[in-house]
Amino acid sequence: MKISRREALSISAATLAGLSLSKLTLNGQQAVAQTADQSDWPSELVERPLRNGFPAPLPLNADGSAPEHPESAAGPISDPLMWRSQGRQTPQIEFDYRQMQIKVDTRGFANKTGTLHFSDLQQLPIRSHTFLLQCGAPNPRGIVKWTGVRFSDFADMLGLIPEAHYCRFIASDRFYIDESVQTLRHPQVMLVWLMNDEPIPPQHGAPLRLIIPFRYGNRSIKAITEMTFSTPGPRMPPLPA
């Protein structure tokens, strides 16, 4: 079906008007919410109690690394589990690590980009380590045996160059973290798919989870769906003396 230029302009104007009205309504709702929030906000600095039990102790070695525990100490992770989704429920995705398809966007900072499969990780040295997973609050908490690969080996497989300074991980519930590549290359940082010698359960982050044992648990992001590498800018050349 063909339409005239006049009709097209009319449709465009109506569409823009609708979008403007929608935006205005949304902004109006936000303004009401902001006004309500601000009306309850203290007009000066006031004393408030600290969060109960926060932060929980996170034992570390003198060099900042995480203590490694014997496999015999491994066990479950305590509740409550944290998901940022409807009803705090585990989002429905493909949980079988053998079927994982994870977007890896290296943005020109590596030789490889595209979709990560389990067969790619199988080419790397597979390792197991037993670490404490500790939330910033007293729970969730647990000593767990994790099996997977070092993130540094994964980065080398991609051919990541030094000018890639950060990686953003996005989870199935759209929670995300940004972490420096320098931190991710620490030998204790892992991409894991087994928990206590079994596939990671959906509620604990199947099919693939990041483990940073020397940070609180929310940095060990669950159910990775995307990884994007970026940089604030290439490193400066040495300055003249």
Task: Indicate residue ranges for each PLM-predicted region.
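Surface-exposed patches in mature extracellular/periplasmic domains of secreted proteins
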Residues: 162-170
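Short, hydrophobic/aromatic alpha-helical segments in well-folded domains
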Residues: 11, 150-154, 196
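Near-N-terminal "mature-domain entry" segment
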Residues: 21-153, 157, 213, 219-241
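A contiguous pocket-lining binding segment that forms or flanks enzyme active sites
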Residues: 175-185, 189-193
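Detector for glycine-centered tight turns/loop "hinges" at secondary-structure junctions
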Residues: 109-111, 174-176, 197-198
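N-terminal secretory signal peptides and thylakoid transit peptides that target proteins
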Residues: 1-19
